[in-house]
Regions:
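Domain-level detector of nuclease and nuclease-like folds
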Residues: 140, 149-268
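N-terminal targeting leaders characterized by basic, low-complexity, disordered sequences
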Residues: 1-30
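Cell wall/extracellular polymer interaction/catalysis modules
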Residues: 69-148, 152-153, 159
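Hydrophobic membrane-insertion alpha-helices, especially the h-region
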Residues: 42-62
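Non-membrane alpha-helical secondary structure
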Residues: 11-14, 21, 73, 77-80, ...
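N-terminal Sec-pathway targeting helices
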Residues: 27-49
Length: 268
């Protein structure tokens, strides 16, 4: 949550007092106006009252403004996530022409050389109580997922009908990456992105399907406590690979970061 700024804090009693001052000024104006002898005196009275009300309102607005700012998101997020977001290029004319998911080679590389595809590495990293197939294989047979997207606990059991309960999500979706600049990459960089564990999470299968290729402008985790981390990771991925954001996407990210202004980028 954003830290409160004492300099911008205000007191309802002070506001009520200022409002009463305006009301009293209005009553004095009405009485003086009735008792005024001529047009010139009435004009002078009007100018004085307008000046008094203007000064009072001027003193009142700064006290109210912080709450308005919090409601509209005018205060500034200052963590590394927000700072990095400001550096990303905005492109409101992305093209998904030529998009091919297979071009990213997901699950076809073994970058760490442990003999396991990246899906198994992500499951082993993100699940707890992990059991491996045959006790020795790198294939995860079962485990428990504390799902970041829904906040639910999911039991993973490998099987034709059960494996899909836990899926591996590209936090920045492959299609979104393609539209954001990946369409210019060579084969090696596409494979690097498609299998980068920094951009991969084990998550609830239905939530992953619901998200599809949506950016933060169109989809956020239902688990509100994870949204700051989710957006920060998307920003980190886009910064790492020089990808762009749309203006609507950027605004959605900033809206989330206003609830956690000191949010840092994930390191791994």
């Amino acid at each position: 949550m954003p830290r409160k700024n004492n300099r911008n804090s205000y007191n309802y009693r002070n506001i009520e007092r200022d409002v009463r001052d305006i009301q009293r000024a209005g009553k004095r104006f009405k009485k003086s106006w009735i008792n005024a002898d001529g047009p010139l005196e009435r004009i002078l009275i009007l100018l004085v009252v307008v000046a008094v009300i203007g000064v009072t309102i001027g003193m009142l607005l700064p006290k109210v403004n912080p709450t308005v700012g919090e409601i509209t998101g005018e205060y500034t997020a200052t963590g590394t996530a927000a700072e990095t977001l400001e550096k990303l290029t905005v492109d409101d004319n992305p093209s998904k022409a030529g998009y091919d998911r297979d071009a990213f080679g997901f699950r076809e590389t073994d970058d760490d050389g442990n003999g396991c595809y990246v899906r198994e590495d992500v499951l082993a990293r993100d699940l707890t109580d992990v059991q491996y197939k045959n006790g020795r294989s790198c294939q995860v047979a079962s485990g428990t997922l504390d799902d970041p997207y829904t906040g639910q606990t999911i039991q993973f059991v490998r099987g034709v009908k059960t494996s899909s309960a836990v899926q591996i999500d590209h936090v920045v979706a492959l299609e979104n990456a393609w539209q954001s600049g990946a369409n210019t990459w060579d084969h090696a960089k596409l494979y690097q992105f498609g299998n980068d564990m920094y951009n991969l999470l084990a998550v609830d299968g239905p939530a992953n399907q619901q998200k599809g290729s949506a950016s933060a402008a169109y989809w956020l985790p239902t688990n509100s406590e994870y949204r700051c981390d989710y957006v920060a990771r998307q920003i980190g991925v886009k910064d790492k690979y020089g990808l762009t954001v749309t203006l609507q996407e950027k605004r959605a990210m900033l809206s989330v970061l206003h609830g956690c202004p000191a949010q840092e980028l994930p390191e791994s």
